[in-house]
Amino acid sequence: LMRALALEILRRKLSVTWWTNIRFEKSFSADLCLLLKASGCIAVSGGLEVASDRLLQLIDKGVTVEQVAKVTRNFTEAGIMVHAYLMYGYPTQTIQETVDSLEMVRQLFEVGVLQSGFWHQFAMTAHSPVGMYPEKFGVVKETETIGTFANNDINYVDKTGIDHDKFSFGLKKSLFNFMHGFCFDYKLQEWFDFKIPKTRIHPDFIANAIEEAEDFNIKPTAKIVWL
């Protein structure tokens, strides 16, 4: 759809500026990102969510952190800004996974493929997969009462017993600094006033991911567009 939109904008010789929400699909190749930029796309927002492959699979997001890194590289190299929706406190998420998620985010900003982001704490809604099948996610609903539209959050108990609230300030403070290009050399422990485990993520995980050459398979139906 976005490819078709970009081609139509160019065909009509329109002068527009646009920004959209996406999923970090692997179909966002370097060429497609250049086409989107030429049509007036200045930025995209997408859900990296918990920045953990296990939890992304549990959510059925359809992406991996490595794939997100490659796609954000393509957008950034095309001159399109990338904003990431980030999440913490997802059911079954461990303290280790929260720390590792922060490290993934730190690396994405450090290598320059992410320009903006915001941490959201997980909230259970009535008709989400967690709300409908809480037992699958290790949580217990405190009530079956469902509110009206846009007022359908449900209180729940996380069986892990982890207090995810306490991570809020450190996650947001670190992100604020990363967005401004500061403090990449800080140890993750410095963002929190309580003991956290060391990250298990390789320090060059994201750098190695974006250095891999893009799989340049041309489909028989591909078009050549001169920009």
Cite the ranges covered by each PLM segment.
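A glycine-rich phosphate-binding loop feature that marks nucleotide/adenosyl-phosphate handling sites
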Residues: 1, 23, 118-126, 196
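Conserved SAM/AdoMet-binding glycine-rich loop
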Residues: 1-81, 90
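A structural motif corresponding to the C-terminal end of an alpha-helix
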Residues: 12, 39, 70-82, 108-113, ...
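Structural beta-sheet core signal
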Residues: 20, 84-86, 119
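Catalytic cores of alpha/beta
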Residues: 31-34, 92-107
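Hydrophobic, well-ordered secondary-structure elements that form the walls
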Residues: 36, 46, 84, 105, ...
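Flexible glycine/acidic-rich beta-alpha junction loops that bind and position SAM and/or redox cofactors
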Residues: 54, 58-59, 88-96, 112-169
